[in-house]
């Protein structure tokens, strides 16, 4: 099997399939990134790219066409805010995200039934409920690693998190005390960051540089250091970084693989099944190409 995109979805898919005995080739256009390669320059990162960015793709050779509200097309580079990109890396955006791990509330699955559908709104009911998805939330929380508090009335998890909540600092303690005086229930933010040593990696060092950068002590949990690592450890998964999926291959009306450019050469990858996990823009591009 071949998976295009080694982010949150593709990384987990690689682990599930490899653990089930399937042979998996996991592709990503980006590289393996760590703190040494992403740095912590607040003028050069994926959110503020005034002087370039730190997550790829390269600024030259990776244009996108952005259409503004007037219908005018603009060719933009990866460091433009109109590029609408998170990160090109093994692990995708999970390398540089803030790591909040909220579940949707049960009402989020019934927005139209709860609030109606005003003209121009996008409120819809999901075809599934919170209870349908809850077991998969739990699997993901334990696979990737979430630190959080006990269940609350607003978010009744069926099982606790694998790690305790992070300790509140002074500002958090002040806010919690004020909320309690007002009779408001509070809960700790569930975070995909180690509050204690976990999975062979260190606990959070409280550097407060999570968003936009890799973790200096590898305490932030993304697919690159959890699901993908475990997929590789099964012996059934290979990872090709810096591999650009150009188009789908077809035979007799069926998808049979991907055409991929890597290390200066074109490769025709044949597979029994193809998983597209390239994000909203790149997945759509592949399907339309």
Give the predicted meaning of each segment.
Residues 174-180, 201-272:
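Helical element adjacent to the flavin cofactor pocket in flavoenzyme catalytic cores
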Residues 16-19, 23-46, 234, 243, ...:
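Glycine-rich loop(s) and the adjacent beta-strand/alpha-helix scaffold that form part
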Residues 123-126, 164-166, 214-221, 276-277:
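Hydrophobic alpha-helical scaffolding
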Residues 6-9, 167, 171, 219-223, ...:
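Short, glycine/acidic-rich beta->alpha junctions
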Residues 88-201:
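Rossmann-like flavin
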Residues 15, 19, 29, 131-142, ...:
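A broad, structural surface signal
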Residues 1-117, 122, 127-131, 135-138, ...:
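N-terminal glycine-rich phosphate/pyrophosphate-binding loop and immediately adjacent elements
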């Amino acid at each position: 099997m071949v998976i295009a995109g080694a982010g949150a979805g593709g990384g987990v898919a690689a682990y599930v399939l490899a653990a089930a005995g399937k042979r998996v080739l996991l592709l990503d256009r980006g590289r393996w990134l760590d703190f040494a390669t992403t740095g912590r320059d607040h003028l050069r990162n994926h959110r503020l790219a005034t002087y370039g960015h730190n997550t790829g793709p390269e600024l030259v050779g990776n244009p996108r066409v952005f259409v503004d509200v007037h219908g005018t097309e603009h060719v933009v580079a990866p460091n433009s805010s109109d590029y609408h990109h998170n990160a090109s890396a093994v692990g995708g955006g999970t390398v540089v995200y803030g790591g909040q791990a909220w579940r949707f509330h049960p009402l989020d699955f019934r927005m139209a039934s709860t609030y109606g559908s005003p003209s121009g709104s996008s409120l819809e009911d999901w075809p599934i409920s919170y209870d349908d998805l809850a077991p998969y939330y739990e699997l993901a929380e334990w696979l990737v690693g979430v630190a959080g508090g006990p269940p609350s009335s607003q978010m009744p998890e069926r099982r606790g998190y694998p790690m305790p909540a992070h300790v509140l600092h002074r500002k958090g303690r002040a806010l919690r005390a004020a909320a309690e005086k007002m009779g408001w229930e509070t809960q700790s933010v569930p975070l995909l960051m180690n509050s204690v040593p976990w999975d062979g990696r260190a606990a959070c060092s409280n550097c407060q540089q999570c968003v936009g950068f890799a973790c200096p002590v590898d305490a932030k949990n993304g697919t690159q250091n959890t699901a993908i690592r475990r997929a590789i450890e099964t012996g059934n998964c290979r990872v090709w970084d810096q591999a650009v999926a150009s188009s789908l291959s077809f035979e007799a009306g069926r998808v049979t693989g991907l055409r991929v450019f890597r290390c200066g050469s074109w490769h025709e990858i044949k597979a029994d099944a193809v998983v597209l996990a390239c994000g909203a823009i790149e997945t759509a591009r592949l399907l339309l190409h």
